Amino acid sequence: MALSCFSLRRLPVLRNALLPALLAVSACSAGESAAPAAPPVTSAASASAAAHATSPGGASGNDRLATLLQASGVQCADAHMAKGCTAGNVDAGDFYDVELSPACGNTGFFAGVAQANGVDVLDAVPTTGSNAIARARLAQGQLVCIQAIGRAGQTPLYYYVIAIPADTVAQCKNNPACGTYGDRPIQRSSTATGDSCHAAAPGQYVGECAQGWVGADALDVFSNGIESPAPA
């Protein structure tokens, strides 16, 4: 009986000592069960990258780049980012480092054909084993957009150009430079069978656009936008 009385006297004390611990365990259990209901945290950088990957603008830029690579014959170590790009015969050591600029909008790179007898636009850079073929001949004064620059060291030796309608270039409006360089007759190596060259979107041209590689000395390159050609 003495033992029974001893236990009964101490039971409230044990209960009071254990109650805070029991409440703490209960709270932890409730927190663990509720945690999965919270939405996952996404970093701003991850969200931005995902939005860019699925945005129409990003896809359009990638499409333009892929089209330019195919038309120009340029090879890139990283085609998606347009890095490590070359044109020519790498195996023979006869090639050029290439900088790409697919867009021909307000920030585009423009020039005019300066040679008196015009210039052929070639399907490949003339290098060892290239067997370059003329796609068309541009007359003196033809306005072109430069989409790629082929360099030996730091010196531009070839440009990949596309002849575009001058009236589709916003910078040409009321610009005297586009009187000197504009639309000129184009001699094609084959009869055009598709749509004429036109702007599908600002800076993006589709249809039968005369395009190809030309020597750097055939052009007057606009050094400050489309305002004035660089001095010879």
Predicted regions and their residues:
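Short alpha-helix capping/helix-loop boundary micro-motifs
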Residues: 126-133
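Short, low-complexity, Pro/Ser/Thr/Gly-rich segments in the mature regions of secreted, periplasmic
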Residues: 214-232
